[in-house]
């Protein structure tokens, strides 16, 4: 992580582009029995968990001005894992987990 920015691992889960703090990533591996699928193991910064995705797109550094918190009203409507913020860049929008 550089000063004033967050380095994110960007993945495509088939529905959205998701970003995970690179410091939290333990390992990325191909999912067994899932051609073209990947399993991202997280847990360096919190509780261990696994995230399945279709593809790993790489990493991106977002500055503080490119990150916006997700309003609580919207977070309540989202089922499953809830993003804490949205990253907005010239390349696209990322849900941050």
Which positions does each model-derived feature cover?
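An acidic, low-aromatic, low-complexity terminal/linker signal
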Residues: 1-97
């Amino acid at each position: 992580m550089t000063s004033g920015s967050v380095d994110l691992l960007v993945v495509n889960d088939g529905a959205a582009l998701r970003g995970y703090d690179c410091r939290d990533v333990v390992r990325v591996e191909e999912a067994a029995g899932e051609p073209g699928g990947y399993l991202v193991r997280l847990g360096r910064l919190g509780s261990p968990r696994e995230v399945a995705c279709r593809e790993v797109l790489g990493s991106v550094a977002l500055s503080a001005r490119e990150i916006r918190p997700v309003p609580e009203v919207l977070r309540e409507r989202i089922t499953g894992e809830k993003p804490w913020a949205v990253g907005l860049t010239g390349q696209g929008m990322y849900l941050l987990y």
